[in-house]
Structure formats: C-alpha cells, structure tokens
C-alpha cells in the first residue's frame, strides 16, 4: 500500500512523531492517542509505523488482567510472539496479546501499517504505555 492509499485508509490520522518512545522502535513511528491516559479505563491509541518500522521485543507485565489488543486499521504488518512464527497482519484483523507474553509488531518492508492498540487495565490503572 503506497503512502497516498494508506493516508486515505487511516481514518484516525497519523498523529505526531512518536519521539517519547523512539528508543523502543527501529524506524519511525507516529502516535495519535484516542483516549486520554488516566481519564479512561482503557488506553486506546493509533500507532502508525512507516515501512520496515517495528518495535523491539517487549512484554506488558501484569499479575492479573493486563495485556494488549491490536486492531489493524490500514496497511500491512507483522506480529510475532517469542517462539512462534510471525503472523501477517492485515486490515480488519484483531490480535489479542495476553499479559507477560514477549512479542513485537511492525510494518512490512513495502507498506505502512497502523494497528490501533488497546491496553487493558490492571486494578484501574494504565500499567503500560509502550507503543
């Protein structure tokens, strides 16, 4: 998907350069929060990855609850859990990531991708805001 097609399909918009979390990414990403942290029981954000951009392996820790849900809005990307094959991520797909599972996600080499992400809460607090 080229940039023009991607911009039309990305209904929530690209957002701003994700400078606060750049250290956790290979390539450039953009963040558009859709809910305000701390004022909503679930943090929802549109994270846009440029082609070849991905985040580092990471874990969303939680003793109870927690986890992450990714919903592919536009473009194509990859999702991988440690010890498993990478999964192609396309518009309309939903990936549920349990707490304490090491994983990464990002764009394919020739496509932008935007997985809208939801961070589930732990005891009424947002416990993870990594993109």
Located regions from the model:
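A short, N-terminal "cap"/entry segment at the start of jelly-roll beta-barrel domains
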Residues: 1-43, 126-131
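Conserved short histidine dyad/triad with adjacent acidic residue
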Residues: 30, 45-64
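Conserved hydrophobic/aromatic beta-strand scaffold that supports enzyme active sites
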Residues: 31-33, 44-48, 69, 86, ...
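Ligand-binding loop in jelly-roll beta-barrel domains
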Residues: 38, 85-86, 90-91, 99-126
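Short, charged/polar surface micro-motifs in flexible loops or helix N-caps
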Residues: 39-40, 49-54, 74-77, 123-124
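Residue-level recognition of conserved beta-strand positions in structured domain cores
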Residues: 46, 59, 73, 81-83, ...
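A short beta-strand-loop-beta hairpin characteristic of the jelly-roll/cupin
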Residues: 54, 64-91, 101
